[in-house]
Amino acid sequence: MKDFTTYLSTAPVLAAVWFGFLAGLLIEINRFFPDALSFSFV
């Protein structure tokens, strides 16, 4: 179990989890606020 927790704390695994979380967050923000980068409300 110690080797498994060491594996989970390595940089590629943490990066994959972080980027997956960030991608999901951006997808959900874009779902609720579509075209937020176009500034069509100005």
Swiss-Prot record:
The chain crosses the membrane at residues 7-27. The keyword Cell membrane does not apply. Signal peptide: none annotated. SUPFAM superfamilies: Subunit IX of photosystem I reaction centre, PsaJ (SSF81544). The keyword Plastid applies. One of its GO terms (cellular component) is chloroplast thylakoid membrane. It holds the Pfam family PSI_PsaJ. GO terms for biological process: photosynthesis. Keywords: Chloroplast, Membrane, Photosynthesis, Photosystem I, Plastid, Thylakoid, Transmembrane, Transmembrane helix. InterPro entries: PSI_PsaJ (IPR002615), PSI_PsaJ_sf (IPR036062). Its main location: plastid. It is found in: Plastid, Chloroplast thylakoid membrane. It is a single-pass membrane protein. May help in the organization of the PsaE and PsaF subunits. Belongs to the PsaJ family. This is Photosystem I reaction center subunit IX. The lineage of its organism: Eukaryota, Viridiplantae, Chlorophyta, Nephroselmidophyceae, Nephroselmidales.
